[in-house]
Amino acid sequence: MKTRLVSITFVLFTSLVLVAQDQYTKGMTKAMSLWGEGKIIEASNLFERIALAEEDNWIPYYYVAQVNTTSSFGEKDVKKLTRQLDKAKEFVAIAQRISPDNPELLVQEAMINTAWMAFDGATYGPVLAGKNTQIYNKALKLAPENPRVVYSKASWDMGSARYFGKDTAPYCADVERALQLFATFESELPFYPSWGEEQAKKELEQCKG
């Protein structure tokens, strides 16, 4: 009888886990679809609801940050920009508490800083440029074979080199290496970040052009 009760409990627990996983997959897929359709607010809100239900999973928190960061590039309304980047910073900080020393989250943190500098380089560049260099160096030390880390650091270094009138050739080689890493990089985590390859290809074309 005891064995039977244990078996029933295990089956019920397994069923609940599978249902939860299925809900997570459906929710994340829907949020990704909304994002792809350009429905930024709806996508962000859905990622946020998923994140609050997945307290030990850094990935939905990451996407709240990423959606709000990427939509901030080119934004002219300072109030909207501040609202989006503050939310991005809040959620990437939570994700970093869940998954410390995560290179993907470090890259996302640097992207938030870059969005501020893209908005007002004179104001934010002196404050955030050095921080970004430190962040990318840390990310590369943690994950030298991660293509997003290699590409993002190379892109950052290339931009800095152009600004100071220095040779960008070494960083073009890093972009090429990133593309090689993209070809083989895999993760078993569902919805693990996968962006960067197309951006790296465009960056490499500029190097050769």
Which role does the model predict for each range below?
Residues 83-90, 126-137, 147, 165-186:
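TPR/TPR-like (Sel1-like) alpha-helical repeat modules
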Residues 1-27:
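Bacterial Sec-dependent N-terminal signal peptides
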Residues 169-209:
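Terminal, low-structured helical/coil segments at or just beyond the last alpha-helical repeat
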Residues 30, 64, 71, 109, ...:
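Structural register within alpha-helical repeat arrays
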Residues 70-79, 110, 115-124, 159-165, ...:
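Short coil/turn linking the two alpha-helices of tandem helical-hairpin repeats
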Residues 21-69, 76:
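Start-of-domain marker
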